[in-house]
């Protein structure tokens, strides 16, 4: 494994776009040991193969503290002996997991990061917003994120593509986690001609501002998004992977009950336009933005 890692490092050829993305990552959060580049020199001088297994066992070798999620179409009494045999064969003892990585610091002011490093004739624009705190239940937050994402994308497509005709598509992504530290991140992205970048960015913020000022303006889109979320929910929950994921996330995030699952449809239906407007205002207008623009390389380059 070490030899392959060294060979991979020595043969990889990073493009200018790769370097752009690395610098952008370092802007989004302060770099530390968790994301430093592992060079061939580091592997040769600092990594010892005989350390790997003891280090793993030190942190993860014992079964204490693990949560096992088992799904089956068989009655519990039929599979219980097999479960007990498996659990009984796991190593005992205590793992050392006191250390918790705190996560990198995020920008507290808006940043503009632009570079002529792209191979495409179009510019790639990303507007990235981050918050380092989570208010309330993360499941409620993620539901608001899903609703806001769907509505915002519809509104941006209507303006940037249908009205202005300057983009083919618009991407809107949202996410939140409590571990290893609280982080919420929202991204709006699109590709366009370099000369259209600023006009599209200005229009994006205008759309966001109008949504916050007039929640009734997206009531139709809100109902469409709600309908689609409930429809997708009914389909997805037929899969076993859905339940293992929901159980894992509930336990992992220390959610005290299962209402985010049992009351999902009611929770979706209860979200109002004002709720969405307040959420968008907090995430997109009251948060510093990292404006990252990957421009085409100059012809002379």
Locate the predicted segments by residue.
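M16 family metallopeptidases and their MPP-like homologs
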Residues: 1-10, 14-45, 63-71, 122-139, ...
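Alpha-helical scaffold elements lining the catalytic groove of polysaccharide deacetylases
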Residues: 44-52
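An aromatic/glycine/proline-enriched structural segment found at the starts
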Residues: 28-34, 62, 67-133, 295-301
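Glycine-rich, charged/polar anion/phosphate-binding loops
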Residues: 52-54, 108-114, 171-175, 276-277
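Mature hydrolase/peptidase catalytic cores and their serpin-fold inhibitory cores, especially
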Residues: 265, 274-278
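Short, hydrophobic/aromatic alpha-helical segments in well-folded domains
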Residues: 23, 51-55, 82, 147, ...
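Active/ligand-binding-proximal structured segments within catalytic/core domains
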Residues: 127, 137-155
């Amino acid at each position: 494994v070490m030899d392959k890692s060294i060979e991979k490092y020595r043969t990889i050829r990073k493009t200018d776009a790769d370097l752009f993305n690395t610098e952008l990552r370092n802007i989004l959060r302060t770099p530390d040991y968790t994301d430093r580049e592992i060079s061939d020199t580091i592997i040769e001088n600092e990594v010892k193969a005989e350390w790997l297994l003891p280090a793993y066992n030190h942190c993860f070798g014992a079964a204490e503290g693990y949560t096992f999620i088992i799904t089956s179409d068989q009655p519990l009494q039929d599979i219980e002996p097999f479960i007990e045999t498996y659990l009984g064969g796991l190593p005992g003892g205590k793992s050392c997991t006191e250390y918790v990585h705190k996560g990198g610091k995020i920008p507290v002011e808006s940043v503009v990061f632009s570079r002529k490093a792209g191979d495409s004739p179009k510019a790639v624009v990303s507007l990235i917003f981050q918050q380092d705190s989570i208010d309330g239940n993360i499941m409620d937050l993620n539901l608001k994120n899903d609703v806001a994402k769907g509505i915002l994308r519809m509104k941006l497509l209507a303006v940037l593509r249908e009205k202005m005709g300057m983009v083919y598509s618009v991407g809107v992504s949202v996410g939140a986690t409590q571990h290893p530290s609280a982080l919420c991140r929202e991204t709006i992205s699109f590709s366009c001609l370099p000369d259209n970048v600023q006009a599209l960015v200005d229009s994006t913020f205008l759309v966001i501002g109008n949504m916050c000022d007039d929640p009734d303006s997206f009531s139709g889109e809100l109902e469409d998004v709600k309908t689609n979320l409930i429809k997708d929910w009914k389909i997805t929950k037929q899969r076993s992977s859905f339940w293992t994921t929901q159980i894992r996330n509930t336990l992992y995030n220390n959610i005290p009950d299962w209402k985010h699952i049992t009351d999902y449809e009611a929770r979706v239906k209860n979200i109002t336009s004002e709720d969405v407007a307040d959420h968008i205002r907090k995430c997109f207008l009251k948060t510093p933005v990292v404006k990252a623009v990957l421009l085409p390389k100059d012809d002379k380059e």
